[in-house]
Amino acid sequence: MKKLLYLFLAVSFIFTACKKEQGCTDAIATNYNADAEEDDGSCAFSITGGSWITQSIEQSGNMTVSMMGIPIIDSVINYTETNADSLDPYKLTFEDDNTYTEHDQLNTEVESGTWSISGDVLTVNTPDTTLSLTLNTLNKDNLSMTINIIESGTEDGITFDINIDQKVNANRESKRWDDWMAK
Protein backbone atom coordinates (compact mmCIF):
# COMPACT_ATOMS: atom_id res chain seq x y z
CA MET A 1 0.00 0.00 0.00
CA LYS A 2 2.85 2.35 0.86
CA LYS A 3 4.47 1.70 -2.54
CA LEU A 4 1.18 2.44 -4.29
CA LEU A 5 0.90 5.75 -2.44
CA TYR A 6 4.48 6.71 -3.39
CA LEU A 7 3.81 5.73 -7.00
CA PHE A 8 0.65 7.86 -7.04
CA LEU A 9 2.52 10.87 -5.59
CA ALA A 10 5.39 10.45 -8.06
CA VAL A 11 3.02 10.29 -11.05
CA SER A 12 1.06 13.32 -9.75
CA PHE A 13 4.28 15.28 -9.34
CA ILE A 14 5.39 14.44 -12.88
CA PHE A 15 2.10 15.60 -14.39
CA THR A 16 2.06 18.88 -12.45
CA ALA A 17 5.73 19.54 -13.26
CA CYS A 18 5.05 19.13 -16.99
CA LYS A 19 2.35 21.81 -17.07
CA LYS A 20 3.21 24.52 -19.60
CA GLU A 21 3.65 28.01 -18.19
CA GLN A 22 1.01 30.37 -19.51
CA GLY A 23 1.40 34.07 -20.20
CA CYS A 24 1.88 36.58 -22.98
CA THR A 25 4.14 35.18 -25.71
CA ASP A 26 4.19 38.26 -27.97
CA ALA A 27 7.60 39.96 -27.77
CA ILE A 28 6.26 43.47 -28.42
CA ALA A 29 3.68 43.32 -25.62
CA THR A 30 4.33 45.29 -22.45
CA ASN A 31 3.68 42.18 -20.36
CA TYR A 32 5.73 39.75 -22.48
CA ASN A 33 6.75 36.63 -20.55
CA ALA A 34 9.83 34.96 -22.08
CA ASP A 35 9.20 31.87 -19.95
CA ALA A 36 5.63 31.38 -21.18
CA GLU A 37 5.13 28.46 -23.51
CA GLU A 38 1.41 28.92 -24.01
CA ASP A 39 -0.26 32.26 -24.82
CA ASP A 40 -3.14 32.92 -22.43
CA GLY A 41 -4.52 35.93 -24.33
CA SER A 42 -3.38 38.43 -21.69
CA CYS A 43 -1.03 40.47 -23.92
CA ALA A 44 -1.19 44.24 -23.42
CA PHE A 45 0.31 46.60 -25.98
CA SER A 46 1.79 50.08 -25.84
CA ILE A 47 2.02 52.88 -28.35
CA THR A 48 5.76 52.11 -28.54
CA GLY A 49 7.23 49.23 -30.50
CA GLY A 50 7.50 50.09 -34.17
CA SER A 51 5.97 52.90 -36.18
CA TRP A 52 2.34 53.69 -36.88
CA ILE A 53 1.42 54.16 -40.55
CA THR A 54 -1.76 56.20 -41.03
CA GLN A 55 -4.39 54.38 -43.09
CA SER A 56 -7.17 56.95 -42.92
CA ILE A 57 -8.19 60.22 -41.32
CA GLU A 58 -11.87 60.80 -40.62
CA GLN A 59 -13.18 64.30 -39.99
CA SER A 60 -16.63 65.29 -38.81
CA GLY A 61 -18.00 68.48 -37.37
CA ASN A 62 -19.21 71.90 -38.43
CA MET A 63 -17.95 75.28 -39.50
CA THR A 64 -19.71 78.62 -39.62
CA VAL A 65 -18.42 81.88 -41.06
CA SER A 66 -20.32 85.15 -40.89
CA MET A 67 -19.64 88.71 -41.96
CA MET A 68 -21.19 91.51 -39.94
CA GLY A 69 -23.63 88.97 -38.46
CA ILE A 70 -24.71 87.60 -41.85
CA PRO A 71 -23.95 83.87 -42.36
CA ILE A 72 -21.65 83.24 -45.33
CA ILE A 73 -20.80 79.59 -44.66
CA ASP A 74 -22.69 77.16 -42.46
CA SER A 75 -21.35 73.71 -43.24
CA VAL A 76 -21.37 70.23 -41.81
CA ILE A 77 -18.07 68.48 -42.45
CA ASN A 78 -17.96 64.70 -42.80
CA TYR A 79 -15.30 62.95 -44.87
CA THR A 80 -12.64 60.27 -44.78
CA GLU A 81 -9.21 60.68 -46.40
CA THR A 82 -7.35 57.52 -47.46
CA ASN A 83 -4.96 58.87 -50.13
CA ALA A 84 -1.46 58.31 -48.71
CA ASP A 85 -0.19 61.57 -50.25
CA SER A 86 -2.78 63.53 -48.27
CA LEU A 87 -2.45 61.84 -44.88
CA ASP A 88 -0.81 64.00 -42.22
CA PRO A 89 0.60 62.61 -40.02
CA TYR A 90 1.72 59.76 -42.26
CA LYS A 91 4.14 57.86 -40.01
CA LEU A 92 4.53 58.28 -36.24
CA THR A 93 7.14 56.54 -34.11
CA PHE A 94 6.78 56.65 -30.32
CA GLU A 95 9.89 55.63 -28.37
CA ASP A 96 10.20 54.16 -24.86
CA ASP A 97 11.96 57.37 -23.69
CA ASN A 98 8.71 59.33 -24.36
CA THR A 99 9.97 60.99 -27.55
CA TYR A 100 8.27 60.76 -30.93
CA THR A 101 9.12 61.50 -34.54
CA GLU A 102 6.81 62.17 -37.45
CA HIS A 103 7.88 61.20 -40.97
CA ASP A 104 6.36 61.93 -44.37
CA GLN A 105 5.77 59.43 -47.19
CA LEU A 106 9.46 59.66 -48.23
CA ASN A 107 10.48 58.77 -44.64
CA THR A 108 11.87 62.28 -44.10
CA GLU A 109 11.57 63.49 -40.52
CA VAL A 110 8.98 66.25 -40.34
CA GLU A 111 9.02 66.99 -36.60
CA SER A 112 9.76 65.49 -33.23
CA GLY A 113 8.78 66.09 -29.64
CA THR A 114 7.66 64.31 -26.49
CA TRP A 115 4.59 62.36 -25.48
CA SER A 116 2.86 60.92 -22.41
CA ILE A 117 -0.20 58.78 -21.71
CA SER A 118 -2.59 59.10 -18.79
CA GLY A 119 -5.50 56.66 -18.95
CA ASP A 120 -6.81 56.86 -22.51
CA VAL A 121 -5.43 60.37 -23.20
CA LEU A 122 -2.28 60.71 -25.31
CA THR A 123 -0.59 64.09 -24.87
CA VAL A 124 1.81 65.05 -27.68
CA ASN A 125 4.11 68.03 -27.19
CA THR A 126 5.05 69.28 -30.65
CA PRO A 127 7.55 72.09 -31.25
CA ASP A 128 4.74 74.68 -31.36
CA THR A 129 1.72 73.27 -29.48
CA THR A 130 0.41 70.54 -27.20
CA LEU A 131 -2.17 68.08 -28.53
CA SER A 132 -4.50 65.92 -26.41
CA LEU A 133 -5.84 62.88 -28.22
CA THR A 134 -8.24 60.22 -26.98
CA LEU A 135 -7.06 56.66 -27.63
CA ASN A 136 -10.04 54.78 -29.06
CA THR A 137 -8.18 51.58 -29.98
CA LEU A 138 -4.67 50.45 -29.12
CA ASN A 139 -3.70 46.84 -29.73
CA LYS A 140 -0.92 44.89 -31.40
CA ASP A 141 -1.74 46.03 -34.93
CA ASN A 142 -4.15 48.98 -34.73
CA LEU A 143 -4.20 52.48 -33.31
CA SER A 144 -7.19 54.79 -33.48
CA MET A 145 -7.07 58.20 -31.80
CA THR A 146 -9.31 61.26 -31.90
CA ILE A 147 -8.64 64.93 -31.37
CA ASN A 148 -11.30 67.62 -31.06
CA ILE A 149 -10.35 70.85 -32.84
CA ILE A 150 -12.24 73.92 -31.66
CA GLU A 151 -11.35 77.35 -33.00
CA SER A 152 -13.20 80.63 -33.18
CA GLY A 153 -12.27 84.17 -33.83
CA THR A 154 -12.92 87.42 -35.64
CA GLU A 155 -10.74 89.14 -38.19
CA ASP A 156 -11.64 92.18 -40.32
CA GLY A 157 -15.35 91.79 -39.46
CA ILE A 158 -15.43 88.09 -40.37
CA THR A 159 -16.32 85.71 -37.54
CA PHE A 160 -15.61 81.99 -37.73
CA ASP A 161 -16.42 79.01 -35.51
CA ILE A 162 -14.95 75.56 -36.14
CA ASN A 163 -15.69 72.38 -34.19
CA ILE A 164 -14.20 69.26 -35.80
CA ASP A 165 -13.40 65.77 -34.52
CA GLN A 166 -10.43 64.28 -36.36
CA LYS A 167 -9.86 60.52 -36.03
CA VAL A 168 -6.54 59.01 -37.13
CA ASN A 169 -6.54 55.27 -37.90
CA ALA A 170 -3.13 53.62 -38.19
CA ASN A 171 -1.50 50.20 -38.46
CA ARG A 172 1.67 49.19 -36.68
CA GLU A 173 4.80 48.74 -38.78
CA SER A 174 6.69 46.47 -36.39
CA LYS A 175 10.40 46.66 -35.79
CA ARG A 176 12.42 43.75 -37.04
CA TRP A 177 12.41 40.65 -34.85
CA ASP A 178 16.17 41.01 -34.26
CA ASP A 179 15.61 44.47 -32.74
CA TRP A 180 13.14 43.05 -30.25
CA MET A 181 15.32 40.14 -29.31
CA ALA A 182 18.20 42.56 -28.56
CA LYS A 183 16.10 44.13 -25.77
Give short role names for the model-derived ranges.
Residues 4-13:
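Sec-dependent N-terminal signal peptides
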Residues 45-110, 118-183:
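Lipid interaction determinants
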Residues 40, 109-112:
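A detector of repeated loop/turn-to-beta-strand junctions in beta-rich toroidal repeat architectures
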Residues 15-17:
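C-terminal motif of bacterial Sec signal peptides marking the signal peptidase cleavage site
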Residues 6, 19-46, 87, 172, ...:
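Primarily marks secretory-pathway-exposed extracellular/lumenal segments that are disulfide-
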